[in-house]
Amino acid sequence: MKIKSVEPFILHLPLTSDSISDSTHSITHWGVVGTVIETTDGLKGYGFTGTHAHLASDRLITACIRDCYAPLLIGEDANEHQRLWTKLARYPSLQWVGRAGITHLALAAVDVALWDLKAKKAGVPLWSLLGGARTDRLEAYNTDIGWLSFSLEDLLAGSARAVEEEGFTRIKLKVGHDDPNNDVRRLEAVRKRLGPDVRIAIDGNGKWDLPTCQRFCERARDLDIYWFEEPLWYDDIAGHAALARSSTIPIALGEQLYTVDAFRAFISAGAVSYVQPDVTRLGGVTEYIQVADLALAHRLPVVPHAGEMSQVHVHLSYWHPASTILEYIPWIKDHFEEPSNVDGGIYRRPQQPGASTTVLKESFERYGKSLS
């Protein structure tokens, strides 16, 4: 299965709302930036990363795929994903460019495409190729009802709809107002509306400092918060560890960590209770597995950050024994041949060969962007 071509692409896909905001970002579209790898026997593998649809930076990722990685891949055996991952990740000329950010996002897209090829060649879904499903039910939690930009009225209506009409028993709400008391009041209202049995997680997107987080957690301690995601700046190991010691609310993080070494540092410091790897930020499926195995060794649950990558994470979550639940944000799923759909709060287990990353032709035609 020799690699014949490596062709990058950019899609800018509309959200389910006109725009959304959390504590640090405001966007109207989601970027799906990736590559199609074709082999000499006619198979095509699709892989991608997720962005905020900023075209100039998206083009940096596709340039890295086209100009840096493609020449290293042409003629190689696509089956040898581990060797190829190491070849790209450790390529000497790229070491000073960066071992995170653009180079790793590009690596993720390539690696996912290689796994997609491998599963298609075997004629099975990725979860089956990896060793089979650990369960027949993967529960979803809904984040798309909880954006910080939503009014309290819309927040309550969306949360109630998700639970009472759509079958979700878990939701996640964004926090991070300049005055944290606003967030406490919103959480109190949602908890009162939904009752005690719904699991409510929160996500700060790294907005607050440690004293603010500690005061917030004290005020919110009776609201039965399932986890507090990214309460502090993403690289602050000591701060997260201090918050973990001072609060009864478990900490979740990982979407902004790019290497297994970064995860190891947080885990070793006791700074995380729920591990949230993302194949689009890590170097694809290959490095994701390393992180999930690390979490398993420390008896920590894995709950992938899946806002833009549930297409692949649904396979990994059905398979890996450390996995528990999976995030649901339905922005991009309908642009793929096999969408990562949820029925009654449960993810459908994929059935088609591959990693569920094959993009619909009409989505390329309608939402594709120029690479230059």
Identify what each model region corresponds to:
Residues 131-247:
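Metal-dependent enolase-superfamily TIM-barrel catalytic cores that perform enediolate-based chemistry
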Residues 105, 111-148:
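Glycine-rich, aromatic-flanked loop segments that form ligand/cofactor-binding clefts
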Residues 49, 142-144, 173-175, 202-206, ...:
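A cross-domain feature marking catalytic cores of carbohydrate-active enzymes
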Residues 354-372:
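Extended hydrophobic packing segments that form well-structured cores
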